[in-house]
Amino acid sequence: MEKYKILECIGHGSFGRIYKVQRLKDGALLAQKEIHFGNITRQEKQYIADEVNILRNLKHPNIVQYCGEELNRSAQVINLYMEYCGHGDLANLIQRYKEEKKRFTEQEVLKFFTQLLLALYRCHYGENAPACDSQWPREIFHPKQSVLHRDIKPANIFLDENNSVKLGDFGLSKLLDNTRVFTQSYVGTPYYMSPEIIRSSPYSAKSDVWALGCVIFEICMLTHPFEGRSYLELQRNICQGNLSCWDHHYSDDVFLLIRHCLEVNSDLRPTTYQLLRSPILSDIRSKLESERVVLEQSDLLHKKHQMLIQLENDLQFREQRLSARESELENVIASRLAQREEILRRELEKQLRDMDARYQRHMQTVVNSMQKMRVTSPVDHNEQPESSTAEMFVDCTIEASQSPLLHIPKLGISKPLQTLSCPGFTLTTQQPILKRPTLRKELSSRALHTTATLMKYRANASSLRTTPIDKDGQITSLQQKNGTSNQVADCMNKLLHTSLDGKKLSPSELCNKFSDGEGLPNRKVSKLSVESDETAVSASSGESVPTDSTLTDTKSKSVFVHPPSPQSLYVEKLEKLNIRSDEVSKPSKASKTLHGYALPSLASPYDVHAEEKIARENEMDGNFKTMKINQHPDEYVLRTPKKIQLLEGQKRSPVKQLGRLGYNKLRRSAMDNAGLELRKAASTSNYTSLQSRTLPGSWRDDEEEIPRPFLRKMLDARMMRA
């Protein structure tokens, strides 16, 4: 790292150039003396070393201050840094005055002379001269070290900004100790050479005084004191003391001082100690000391001011660096915040996109599900509702009437299906958990089978059975005894006994009327849920309800008690399969029956006790082993719609699908037992024996027989399902 900055070249020395430089750490101006030692002799190198050693130890206000050296071995250059004197050397000043034909004042001459004496005193005696008002030591005092300049001339005397004299360029100076008072060698300028040097006498401190006298004479007269056409003539004039010229422009005191310094006899020549004690120089010295104190104070203040300025500059520089650092930190923080905000924004956008994608997928799923499961309420009863069998609801309102006419409840979608209560077994209220596609397919198949089967049996008058009546001739119901009411059983009771108790119609007439759709609401449904006829209620005529013994004891009653109809047996199977669900599915085409009608059903909110159910189931299993079948030739083919006939001939019929789901339960049902008896009777073709085998409370005498084709198709369907 560079410590100095070169400003300009200010001169040439004995061994190189002299530059004006600036010290970077404090801005002080210095003079850099460049000395190349690569091509110089050993003696010249010793001169350089001596000068460096001398300058390190010489510190005086009138001596050029040594500031340091810098060695560059690669370039073989040594740089000496000394105090910079802004007004140049004394030789240039004399030349300028000579050109301008100006003369120095006597005070200026005495001032230069006194300052040079003080500098030589420091070199000769090794210490500063005592103050002018103090006690001077004796002249016999010998300093420990003495320095002989040996090259005092105007070119080696410098002036600073205050025109103070600075003695410099100690390149030819010789360091003497106490044992070596004189030196035999001399190298200097001939115009300032002392007589003893010309006579080859030893060189002493008084030789520097001779050179000082020559310099003061040149300052006064602006010319050399000794002149000659040749070197010999110059030497002769120096040895004789013949001065070139002298005018009376200055006082005699000045001339006497110069004359004493140019004494040819060195023994009579005064020393610096004697010259400083002269009265004429004492006054000048006092003034110089006063000026020096003022200058020192001024320099001190100036240095302090410069120091303050430097501190202010440093503080300002640090403030600028701090401000730049703050702005840089702010930019870094802002950039990092911006990056963080960008990252958070991207993450938030990604989350929003993910949420939107999930929402879109969810909405698409919901839309697809709603498109598959959408249910819209019909405007009127003539409009087909867009609902599946599981979405069908039943209106629980039944018109109460005292008339024995048949009143069938209307089907609607206002209320959900309730839990069915069937006699002979206990049903749980927990709904089976099925997946949506499986449930939709299963419910559609079950609804198709339910509707097709009921429509098939509805065409036969032999499927209509009556219920027991009590002693007073009124129709009774088991559940009325338990304090409950079943509207589906009431409707079935009314439907089955209208011909006998109401309008006295025959089974054939009732079948025809029922097939024509009389008394049924003009509404299409997709699923039928009915209940066992064991829970039938009395008709609107207000007949009483018989007890359970009416079903089993045939001898105690005089009226005929018919076995359960195929509708009730089929309902019992559905109940054992626990087919109940509120899930939504689209209506299937197979759910549309003949004329769009199906028997309505309502769910009973109450169940009988478990023991009574088991007892009834056992009784039903024992009582329905034989049936009386009335034959009606080709009634099934004539009255059954073509759609039902086709459905029964399908490869995968609803009956087969329903049989897959509940095979074990169906085999244990009463209908399977009755179906097996019918199958055996059909295989033996013993219709008379089948007719003679009647259940307790036998069939009615005027009841028509089931046609053989219808019976065979029914049994084939049961066997296929099993």
Curated annotation (Swiss-Prot):
Chief location: cytoplasm
Domain Protein kinase: 4-281
Biased composition annotated in UniProt, kind: Polar residues: 535-546
Enzyme class: transferase
Binding site for ATP: I10, G11, H12, G13, S14, F15, G16, R17, I18, K33
GO CC terms, sorted: cytoplasm; cytosol; mitotic spindle; mitotic spindle pole body; nuclear envelope; nucleus
CDD domains: STKc_Nek2 (cd08217)
Region feature (Disordered): 528-557
Catalysed reactions, semicolon-separated: L-seryl-[protein] + ATP = O-phospho-L-seryl-[protein] + ADP + H(+); L-threonyl-[protein] + ATP = O-phospho-L-threonyl-[protein] + ADP + H(+)
GO biological process, one term: negative regulation of septation initiation signaling
SUPFAM superfamilies cross-referenced by the UniProt entry: Protein kinase-like (PK-like)
Keywords assigned: ATP-binding, Cell cycle, Cell division, Cytoplasm, Cytoskeleton, Kinase, Mitosis, Nucleotide-binding, Serine/threonine-protein kinase, Transferase
Key word Heme present: no
Any GO molecular function: ATP binding
Protein location: Cytoplasm, Cytoskeleton, Microtubule organizing center, Spindle pole body
Keyword Cytoplasm part of the UniProt annotation: yes
UniProt cross-references to InterPro entries, sorted A to Z: Kinase-like_dom_sf, NEK_Ser/Thr_kinase_NIMA, Prot_kinase_dom, Ser/Thr_kinase_AS
Residues at the active site: D151 (proton acceptor)
The enzyme's E.C. designation: 2.7.11.1
PANTHER family the record matches: CAMK FAMILY PROTEIN KINASE, NIMA-RELATED KINASE 2
Family note: Belongs to the protein kinase superfamily. Ser/Thr protein kinase family. NIMA subfamily.
Record's function text: Promotes chromosome condensation and nuclear envelope dynamics during mitosis. Activity appears at metaphase-anaphase transition.
Name of the featured protein: G2-specific protein kinase fin1
Species whose genome carries this gene: Schizosaccharomyces pombe (strain 972 / ATCC 24843)
